[in-house]
């Protein structure tokens, strides 16, 4: 159990780093990227799925219209899923925008599928209404699609806090910095294991039917492309910036959704667990995703119980040390929770708390899936 926990959170990253270093030693470092010229760029749609986003329409459109991409090759599509605020009315002020409206709220996956049916360009990039992307993002994405092995491009998610000391945002940001490093190395080894919905793009000719009840539409859509034999290329040079969750309660909504969606995807993508089909993909997928979403949270509990029994039966000093370290870590987590509730800040204690918080939400995701597994609609986490 200890080895499973270590491998999931540290060991895979260490192993991946060693493999990448060896690969660079024999094949050299990746060449410096050169962005394609206007003539080389393919047509692309930026699709934004929205539910009641009237507060961010103006900011999002200002960001979108400032992107560096030829206007004759670029389309903007907003898919509004059951919005009952002023989102549609505000969008009508922009003649550049194609508005695809569904009066019924069926969830983001159904909205994406609705938008894809209206698509008229070679590629499509997806982004959220509340995220801002860098000026060269779409050119960078187009550059990576010039590789015929690439069927999906994942940008980088960056999390910002509106003011210093917002611990929920800082915890989320720390997690995504680690996650982005793993994605970069995964991509360099072969393929990233999934794309983040804040910014990713696909070749629509490779789209696989994603169930409407999918909670992780971005992950499912991108991994179906890997399943079909293409790669997900990851680039930090195309990034989406969003503010972190307003507080730990709001962040819990996101973690619960990710956990529930992760369990859904393990079942729907179970053929990818077969090492005889795609050996390298199976290794990356199990190591980076499956263990974290299913096995390891349970292993943490079993590890503590078994370790306690071994100490009780006086098996050896090593197990006493391991139990003390575990209890100390959980006490640090408890202290981090206590301080956070009172508005105090301690990064070390909060990091321990955030780790435990993530794993608790895996079990909450399991419970959610049992009671709400047939709906793809989800309550949005309020941002800071």
Which residues fall in each region the model found?
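N-terminal membrane-anchoring/stem segments of glycan-assembly enzymes
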Residues: 1-36
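Membrane-embedded multi-pass helical conduit in multi-pass membrane proteins
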Residues: 18, 22-26, 38, 242, ...
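Long helical/loop segments within the catalytic core of UDP-sugar-dependent glycosyltransferases
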Residues: 20, 101-104, 110-111, 117, ...
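Cell-envelope/extracellular polymer assembly enzymes that use nucleotide-activated donors
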Residues: 42-45, 75, 220
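A conserved acidic beta->alpha catalytic loop
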Residues: 45, 63, 77-88, 104, ...
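Acidic helix N-cap motif at the loop->helix transition within catalytic regions
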Residues: 56-59, 73, 84-93, 136
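Short, acidic, metal-binding catalytic loop of nucleotide-sugar glycosyltransferases
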Residues: 62-73
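Catalytic donor/gating beta->alpha subdomain of glycosyltransferases that bind UDP-sugars
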Residues: 145-178, 213-217, 222-288, 354, ...
């Amino acid at each position: 159990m200890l080895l499973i926990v270590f491998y999931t959170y540290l060991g895979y990253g260490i192993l991946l780093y060693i493999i990448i270093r060896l690969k660079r030693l024999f094949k050299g470092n990746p060449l410096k990227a050169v962005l394609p010229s206007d003539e080389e760029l393919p047509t692309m749609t930026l699709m934004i799925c929205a539910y009641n986003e009237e507060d961010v329409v103006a900011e999002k459109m200002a960001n979108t219209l400032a992107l560096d991409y030829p206007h004759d090759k670029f389309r903007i599509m907003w898919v509004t899923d059951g919005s009952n605020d002023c989102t549609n009315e505000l969008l009508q002020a922009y003649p550049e925008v194609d508005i695809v409206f569904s009066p019924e709220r069926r969830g983001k996956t159904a909205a994406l599928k609705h938008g894809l049916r209206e698509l008229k360009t070679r590629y499509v990039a997806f982004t959220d209404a509340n995220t801002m992307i860098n000026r060269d993002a779409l050119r960078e994405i187009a550059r990576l699609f010039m590789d015929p092995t690439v069927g999906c491009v994942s940008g980088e998610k960056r999390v910002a806090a509106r003011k210093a000391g917002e611990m929920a945002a800082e915890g989320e940001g720390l997690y995504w910095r680690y996650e982005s490093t793993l994605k970069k190395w995964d991509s360099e080894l072969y393929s990233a294991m999934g794309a983040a919905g804040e910014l990713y793009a696909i070749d629509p000719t490779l789209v696989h039917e994603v169930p409407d009840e999918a909670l992780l539409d971005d992950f499912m859509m991108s991994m179906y492309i890997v399943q079909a034999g293409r790669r997900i290329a990851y680039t930090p040079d195309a990034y989406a910036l969003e503010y972190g969750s307003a507080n730990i309660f709001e962040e819990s909504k996101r973690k619960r959704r990710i956990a529930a969606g992760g369990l859904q995807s393990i079942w729907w993508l179970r053929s990818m667990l077969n090492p005889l089909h795609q050996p390298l993909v199976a290794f990356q997928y199990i190591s980076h995703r499956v263990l974290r979403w299913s096995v390891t949270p349970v292993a943490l509990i079993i590890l503590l119980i078994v370790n306690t029994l071994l100490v009780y039966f006086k098996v050896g000093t090593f197990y006493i040390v391991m139990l003390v370290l575990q209890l100390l870590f959980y006490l640090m987590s408890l202290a981090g929770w206590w301080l956070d509730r009172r508005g105090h800040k301690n990064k070390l204690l909060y990091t321990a708390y955030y780790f435990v918080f993530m794993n608790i939400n895996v079990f909450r995701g399991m419970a959610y899936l049992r009671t709400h597994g047939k709906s793809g609609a989800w309550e949005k986490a309020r941002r800071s």
